[in-house]
């Protein structure tokens, strides 16, 4: 097969591993900087151009779309879908997962475990917003934040009110969530490929840090999932329509709750913690899907 990896940096671990896995399985691979692509949007022959030339017809594309380029990145993915390429994750599914509010509403609709959450822009009763999720301590998040940026733990109701007021001052959309104290600053990253959890790791925040992101100094280790945790991760991926994703869970007193579904999960942490060849599993998934006609759900209609 001819495969394109949409990535802004060919030296990144995840990009390199996907390229190595695809080449090892006998495929042709191009790495294309998503932002340097430009599109010819015509009704008879849509195309994507790069470095002054139209890109060839790819059997499959692997989008590695960073949060900061979601709008343009998903437009490029959608253009490839219109050209008939199979996308590991469809443009519409990536867009769903990047919108924190929309993704939580979709998970809620499917009855998937979530922390108690409030959403606001300019609430007329901040005290009620905080009380409605159980009161302090609460976690307050900027809707557009990534990698733990824009996430604040408020230990008291007064502190929570002050933080909400500060975010209101910059006209930000915010999420207010119950703090799952029993998780102990740890979460579980479940790596889902093709409707199955293929690897899982427990990420522990640095001492004194409630955020467990590896970018913030957290550590990772192999973890054994319960059947309920495994089913929750698979259901969350399905609710987003994502074939490949990282589902972040917290172990709460009332069962696993989903914190985030990541459409472009990194491979370095999960492969190091589990010693599993996740990149190879992704390429194998593409091979299996390409053997079936019409394997892209929306075929670019999204």
Curated annotation (Swiss-Prot):
Residues 104-287 form the ATP-grasp domain. Gene3D superfamilies: 3.40.50.20, ATP-grasp fold, A domain (3.30.1490.20), ATP-grasp fold, B domain (3.30.470.20). Its cofactor is Mg(2+); Mn(2+). It is an enzyme of class 6 (ligase). Binds 2 magnesium or manganese ions per subunit. It comes from the Bacteria. Mn(2+) 2 binds at residues 260, 262. Keywords: ATP-binding, Ligase, Magnesium, Manganese, Metal-binding, Nucleotide-binding, Protein biosynthesis. Mn(2+) 1 binds at residues 248, 260. One of its GO terms (cellular component) is cytoplasm. InterPro entries: ATP-grasp, ATP-grasp_RimK-type, ATP_grasp_subdomain_1, RimK, Rimk_N, Rp_bS6_RimK/Lys_biosynth_LsyX. Mg(2+) 2 binds at residues 260, 262. GO terms for biological process: protein modification process; SOS response; translation. Its EC number is 6.3.2.-. ATP binds at residues 141, 178-179, 187, 211-213. Pfam families: RimK (PF08443), Rimk_N (PF18030). Belongs to the RimK family. PANTHER family: RIBOSOMAL PROTEIN BS6--L-GLUTAMATE LIGASE, RIBOSOMAL PROTEIN S6 MODIFICATION PROTEIN. This is Probable alpha-L-glutamate ligase 1. It comes from Pseudoalteromonas atlantica (strain T6c / ATCC BAA-1087).
């Amino acid at each position: 097969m001819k495969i394109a990896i949409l990535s802004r940096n060919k030296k990144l671990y995840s990009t390199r591993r996907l390229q190595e896995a695809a080449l090892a399985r006998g495929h042709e691979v191009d790495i294309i900087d998503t932002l340097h692509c430009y599109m010819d949007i015509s009704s008879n022959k849509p195309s994507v151009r790069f470095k002054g030339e139209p890109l060839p017809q790819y059997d499959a594309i692997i989008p590695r779309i960073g949060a900061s380029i979601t709008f343009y990145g998903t437009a490029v993915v959608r253009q490839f879908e219109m050209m008939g390429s199979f996308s590991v994750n469809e443009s519409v599914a990536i867009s769903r997962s990047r919108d924190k509010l929309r993704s939580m509403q979709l998970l809620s609709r499917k009855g998937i475990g979530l922390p108690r959450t409030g959403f606001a822009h300019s609430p007329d009763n901040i005290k009620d917003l905080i009380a409605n999720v159980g009161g302090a301590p609460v976690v307050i998040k900027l809707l557009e934040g990534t990698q733990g940026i824009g996430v604040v733990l408020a230990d008291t109701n007064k502190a929570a009110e002050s933080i909400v007021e500060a975010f209101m001052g910059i006209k930000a959309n915010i999420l207010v969530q119950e703090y799952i104290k029993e998780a102990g600053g740890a979460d579980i990253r479940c790596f889902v490929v093709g409707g199955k959890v293929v690897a899982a790791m427990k990420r522990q925040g640095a001492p004194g840090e409630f955020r467990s992101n590896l970018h913030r100094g957290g550590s990772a280790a192999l973890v054994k999932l319960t059947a309920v945790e495994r089913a929750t991760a698979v259901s969350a991926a399905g609710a987003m329509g994502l074939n490949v994703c990282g589902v972040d869970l917290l172990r709460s007193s009332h069962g696993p709750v989903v914190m985030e579904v990541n459409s472009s999960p990194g491979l370095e942490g999960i492969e190091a913690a589990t010693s599993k060849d996740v990149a190879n599993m992704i390429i194998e998934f593409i091979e299996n899907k390409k053997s079936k006609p019409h394997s892209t759900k929306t075929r670019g209609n999204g």
